[in-house]
């Protein structure tokens, strides 16, 4: 009788052990899987960009502190604020930099040392800025071939030149931020201002063409709703539906 009971007893103890083992394996897989939403650094970039764009300097100040605490370097945050001037103008970009300077001074006075971070590498003197910028713009648009100017770019050729040679070359070629980060900052700024649906759609598509996932885009929209405004988030969701339908 003892020999008859042993297999049954083994099964009795093995089954709970197997259940526990499967549970532990599922936890390990969850821990090793990449996060689907925006990480802390990305969330900080979104908030800094949004508050700089809409001029909410009171909320910008804690957002800058959050960005530093999330691990962004001084130079990365400077780059975010400088990058934005091409979309929101010098005045608001300069306001953002002024607030950031004050935040750093206050932190230094309290004995907090923030990481300076990498500075931008010099651009090669031989860089063909027109060709480089045209290629960057085509990449953001998801186009293999560079298209000739049309519409407003053909109507005012000089702005096409400025876009290619300055925005998409002088600015985008700076290696402090990658293209995905730049596009994330751009859509945060554009989504925080009214009447920019067309530009937001282009750059939201550009962000996805630079590697922003649908889950990260959803996280961006949720953050916009929670920390910037439901009206801005609702308008951005309308644009996002169009972008997701084509990606």
PLM regions: where:
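Extracellular/lumenal glycan-associated surfaces
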Residues: 50, 189-194
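Bacterial N-terminal signal peptides
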Residues: 16-26
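Bacterial N-terminal signal peptides that target proteins for export
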Residues: 7-17
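Acidic, glycine/proline-rich low-complexity segments that act as flexible tails and inter-domain linkers
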Residues: 4, 28-42, 53-70, 76, ...
